[in-house]
Amino acid sequence: MSNETNKAQDNQIDEQVESIVEGELLTEGSDEASLMDELTQANFRVEELEKALQEAQSTVDSQKDSVIRAAAEVDNIRRRAAIDVEKARKFALEKFANELLPVLDNMERALQGTDAEAEATKAIYEGVELTAKSFVSAVEKFGLTQVDPQGEAFNPELHQAIGMQPSTDFAANTVMMVMQKGYTLNERLLRPAMVMVSQG
């Protein structure tokens, strides 16, 4: 009887061990499934985070490019503004200088029409001459310069040809007579010199 009891107990113990092992295997299987689910979710989350990181990096790159472009645009605007201010400063007198040119022309005509040697007009001539020199000196301080090309080669950028005449005294395309002087303001042409050009 004790053998049978021992066998029954052994069978019972074996069954209990098997059920415990099966339970553990089931638990391990569910733990593995749970771990696999967690791993899959973690991988999915990592992919989402990597995608979000790439989008954020793309946004950062785009914003960095926008900042660089904006800084370059600001520099360009600053440079253009400085150039515009410099031009405005240099050429603010242009309209005023244009109004003064007829006064200078009239003084030169007065000098040309007055006899410097005649006793009656000598004092007037000297007075107009001094006034003209003083006036020219004053306007030169502000960048106004006379263009008097007598005897120079004709330059269409600075001179306006009134006509051409044959001449043995001057080479071809040489200014042989200045009808009206030209003027520049800070090296920019204000009025071309009216000239007669030699044909040669």
From Swiss-Prot:
Single GO molecular function: unfolded protein binding
Top-level taxon: Bacteria
Example of a GO cellular component annotation carried by this entry: cytosol
UniProt keyword annotation of Metal-binding present: no
One Pfam family cited in the UniProt record for this chain: GrpE
Main location: cytoplasm
Gene Ontology biological-process entries: protein folding
Subcellular location as annotated: Cytoplasm
Cited InterPro entries: GrpE, GrpE_coiled_coil, GrpE_head
Quaternary structure annotation from Swiss-Prot or TrEMBL: Homodimer.
Designated name of the protein: Protein GrpE
Organism: Shewanella piezotolerans (strain WP3 / JCM 13877)
Gene assigned in the entry: grpE
